[in-house]
């Protein structure tokens, strides 16, 4: 049987595509440093690079583009939904014969033309962002046609994050003596109070870490699986020494630095959701295994004991002091999030079907928010990506993106089982890691606006592409 992946791989491995892949690695490695693309000019520069790489890829493969897109057939439905989602945002910036003076009423009026978006220029910028996210998702799916490329991308994302974590800890303990990327107001927490990486907001950085930390475990699994046959007959001490002195030793050290950095963000949601995502991932993997109930119960018990042991060790080492101090003083107090959520709900009630335009929430929210929130810039976001999406794009936009995301998540979940059946071996750890990463940011977005930081959104789609592609590879 001839595989489309094999035929397509010959095309995609030519030198021109290798250069595109290397350039993509460079772009995603650098992208977290300038505030993760928080400022418009930063991300427009970043998105220009992504669009340029995509254009170069399609020019290089113009003769075989139809064969290339055959590889996307398995996720055709979510890609169609994502395309319609982008077209809906185009519709939001085009003048239409409708009357929206009363936000609750959307009537046809051929004598008065206006846009759905209350600020079309802002929505246009958001459209460019969202288009670049979907573009890099498709480009990554097309480029990841070999096991080596998948591993290389995972290593790039993980090592880049580890370097930022080291930078964060150095500044945390030196009180910002080596700060290269200052926070943008209103996010002005001191380094000793909260590590925030190269970002402004520590919760954004915490979400970034929960995306990239699981990749380290996947890479370690990959190396262990690859070297398992070479270590037959060796003593446990010898295997342990080899582990510590090998690439895996570097990965373990990097993971330690990254996990400590996560604690030092003092992000209650980020740390809690990270643990929850690990638990969810464990039970999803366990569910996919055809094992006796007793064996599953044994694994669950060992997992719980292991989690408790790690938690106790971490707490007693003092690495969680920033987090424990915040929890001691604030607990899980929502810090005004309930009022921010109510603000979003008020806007949704006014224009439920089509929304006010992508990216317009910060502009409109002051008319609806409670006086208790004051004029602080921190309340310009809903601190819930789902509510903000509903207010910006209404039921139509929310349904399109939500359905596409759920279908991709289902594909990722089913891939956990498919990877085991196809015996993709060393990549199975990365398959699990990608599922854990995706679950983490989706859950954290219930209490924050993580997808509004461009680098988090781009890394989400990169890791999602890794998880979707692994089950499709031949051994």
Q: Which positions does each model-derived feature cover?
A:
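Cytoplasmic juxtamembrane interface segments
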Residues: 58-72, 137-153, 321-339
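Juxtamembrane membrane-water interface segments that cap and precede transmembrane helices
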Residues: 32-33, 107-120, 185-198, 335, ...
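Alpha-helical transmembrane segments of multi-pass inner-membrane proteins
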Residues: 1-15, 19-34, 44-58, 79-93, ...
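Transmembrane alpha-helix boundary signature
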Residues: 58-72, 88-106, 111-115, 121, ...
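TM-adjacent membrane-interface loops and short helices in multi-pass inner/ER membrane proteins
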Residues: 92, 201, 338-380, 386-389, ...
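Short beta-alpha connecting loops at secondary-structure transitions
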Residues: 324-330, 374-375, 422-427
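Aromatic-rich transmembrane-lumenal/periplasmic boundary elements in polytopic membrane proteins
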Residues: 95-108, 122, 167-183, 196, ...
């Amino acid at each position: 049987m001839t595989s489309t992946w094999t035929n397509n791989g010959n095309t995609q491995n030519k030198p021109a595509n290798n250069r595109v892949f290397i350039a993509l690695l460079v772009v995603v490695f650098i992208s977290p440093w300038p505030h993760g693309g928080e400022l418009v000019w930063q991300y427009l520069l970043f998105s220009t690079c992504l669009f340029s790489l995509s254009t170069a890829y399609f020019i290089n493969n113009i003769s075989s583009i139809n064969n290339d897109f055959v590889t996307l057939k398995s996720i055709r439905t979510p890609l169609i939904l994502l395309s319609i989602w982008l077209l809906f945002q185009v519709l939001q910036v085009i003048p239409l014969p409708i009357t929206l003076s009363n936000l609750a009423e959307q009537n046809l009026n051929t004598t008065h033309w206006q846009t759905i978006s209350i600020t079309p220029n802002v929505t246009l910028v958001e459209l460019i962002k969202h288009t670049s996210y979907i573009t890099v998702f498709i480009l990554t799916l097309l480029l990841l046609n070999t096991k080596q490329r998948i591993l290389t991308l995972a290593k790039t994302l993980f090592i880049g994050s580890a370097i930022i974590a080291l930078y964060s800890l150095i500044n945390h303990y030196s009180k910002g003596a080596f700060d290269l990327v200052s926070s943008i107001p209103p996010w002005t927490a001191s380094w000793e109070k909260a590590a925030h990486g190269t970002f402004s907001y520590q919760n954004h950085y915490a979400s970034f870490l929960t995306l990239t930390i699981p990749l380290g475990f996947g890479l370690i699994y990959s190396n262990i699986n690859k070297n398992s046959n070479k270590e037959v007959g060796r003593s446990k001490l010898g295997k342990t020494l080899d582990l510590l002195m090998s690439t895996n030793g570097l990965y373990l050290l990097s993971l330690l630095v990254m996990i400590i950095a996560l604690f030092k963000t003092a992000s209650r949601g980020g740390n809690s959701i990270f643990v929850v995502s690990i638990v969810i991932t464990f039970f999803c993997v366990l569910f996919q295994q055809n094992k006796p109930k007793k064996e599953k119960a044994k694994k669950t018990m060992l997992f719980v004991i292991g989690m408790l042991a790690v938690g106790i060790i971490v707490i007693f080492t003092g690495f969680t002091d920033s987090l424990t101090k915040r929890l001691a003083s604030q607990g899980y107090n929502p810090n005004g999030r309930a009022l921010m959520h109510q603000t979003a709900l008020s806007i949704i009630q006014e224009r439920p079907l089509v929304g006010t335009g992508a990216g317009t929430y910060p502009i409109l929210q002051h008319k609806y928010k409670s006086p208790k929130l004051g004029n602080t810039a921190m309340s310009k976001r809903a601190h819930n990506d789902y509510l903000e999406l509903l207010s910006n794009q209404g039921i139509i936009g929310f349904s399109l993106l939500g359905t596409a995301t759920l279908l991709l998540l289902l594909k990722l979940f089913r891939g956990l089982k498919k990877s085991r059946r196809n015996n993709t071996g060393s990549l199975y750890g990365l398959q699990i890691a990608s599922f854990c990463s995706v679950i983490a940011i989706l859950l954290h977005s219930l209490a924050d606006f993580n997808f509004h930081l461009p680098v988090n959104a781009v890394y989400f789609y990169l890791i999602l592409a890794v998880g979707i592609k692994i089950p499709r590879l031949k051994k």
